[in-house]
Amino acid sequence: MSEHVKTELVDGVLVLTLQRPDKKNALTGAMYDALSDGLERAEADGTIKVVLFQGDGDSFTAGNDLADFAAQAKSNSDKESPAFRFIQNLGKATKPLIAAVQGNAVGVGTTMLLHCDLVFLAETARLMTPFVNLALVPEAASSWLLPARIGHVRAYQMFALGEPIDATTALASGLANAVVPATELRQKAMAAAVTLTKRPAGALSATKKLMRDFERIAARIVDESELFKERLRTPEAREAFAAFAERRQPDFTKPSS
């Protein structure tokens, strides 16, 4: 388990808390593995009825820790990445997933919400999917799930322009159940989670199975992953990551490949 992910079982709710607030809860490979361990534990343990994701500090998560991500991409090019393992576990989760989101939810911090059955946002929440900014493509089946949820043009705006949307807009777009004051966020999410623990677990899983096309989600996750890995090897991606490391704006004016 990662020191930056706290795992706690409370009244049938497995609470997974991101605890790297000094880095805006940016996700490392170890953190992804810890989250996957939690999801796999939930699937195998009948006493766990619901999984709740939350983050310490003023951000839910800044997405990938890019330095860690780049290092892993070089060293594990032929292996299943921790991020991919987590995304696969999200896609096949049969138990209710709930998210409590405050501040920034960047990249996977937003796409993972598409796999959550209930999403509660603090008034400070901002959702952002800046994959194209890094010369990459969407992941977590979001290239299918997001347009299906909010429509093509709004999804394309989020992907291609990479601009954040605020909590009110996210709620109106169907990406969340409620917007609440930050001080009430965790209480609201936990109350919903506890309510679900009292519902018949079999009926909840059967309902989720009817609502989600698990096979299509799994296939899209693989398709995105293959294209994602291809994009990582392009000059555009190398320029994007170099610009990030050098704290400058990337220059994509050269011919791409």
Locate each region found by the language model.
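Terminal low-complexity tails and localization/encapsulation signals of metabolic enzymes
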Residues: 2, 242-257
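Conserved CoA-thioester-binding segment of acyl-CoA-metabolizing enzymes
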Residues: 1-56
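CoA-thioester-processing core
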Residues: 86-93, 100, 106-160, 173, ...
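C-terminal long alpha-helix characteristic of the crotonase
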Residues: 21, 120-125, 176-223, 229, ...
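Glycine- (often His-adjacent) and acidic-residue-rich active-site loop
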Residues: 4-6, 40, 55-92, 105, ...
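Acidic, divalent-metal-coordinating active-site segment for phosphoryl/phosphodiester hydrolysis
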Residues: 162-169
